């Protein structure tokens, strides 16, 4: 069972898709290395196919529980190496497009 933090976002116009994903991966890899996240997945819209106006990239970050997610947020601020790659990634994001969602596996332990 996991909590899944999902972000939809586009990169800024002057940034390539590859640079966007490379910078994002540096940050997310740091969270995994520091045991603050289980894993992640980055996907890109295929052929522009979608039923609503969502940004092009989807980032799914999987956490054991809400405490691990909270710990990931804290290390982003407190660890200089993690903060550096976080800032490096954030400057590539088109902030007008970013959307955040929090999902969980269902049914979870509370629903069984």
Model-derived features: positions:
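Short, well-ordered beta-strand segments in beta-rich or mixed alpha/beta enzyme
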Residues: 3-11, 41-78
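Residue-level signal for secondary-structure boundary sites
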Residues: 15-17, 67-69, 108
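Short amphipathic alpha-helical segments
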Residues: 15-42
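Generic alpha-helical structural signal
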Residues: 21-25, 70, 83
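A common structural junction motif
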Residues: 27-29, 77-85
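Short, surface-exposed, polar/charged, turn-prone segments marking secondary-structure boundaries
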Residues: 33-38, 59, 66-72, 86-91, ...
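Glycine-rich beta-strand-turn "strand-cap" elements at beta-sheet edges
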Residues: 41-55, 81-112
């Amino acid at each position: 069972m996991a909590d899944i933090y999902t972000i939809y976002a586009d990169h800024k116009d002057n940034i390539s898709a590859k640079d966007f994903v490379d910078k994002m991966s540096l940050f997310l890899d740091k969270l995994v290395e520091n045991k603050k996240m289980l894993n992640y997945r980055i996907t890109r819209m295929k052929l522009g196919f979608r039923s609503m106006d969502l940004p092009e990239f989807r980032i799914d970050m999987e956490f054991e529980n809400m405490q691990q997610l909270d710990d990931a947020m804290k290390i982003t601020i407190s660890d200089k190496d993690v903060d550096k790659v976080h800032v490096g990634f954030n400057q590539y994001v088109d902030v007008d497009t970013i959307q955040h969602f929090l999902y969980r596996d269902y049914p979870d332990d509370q629903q069984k």
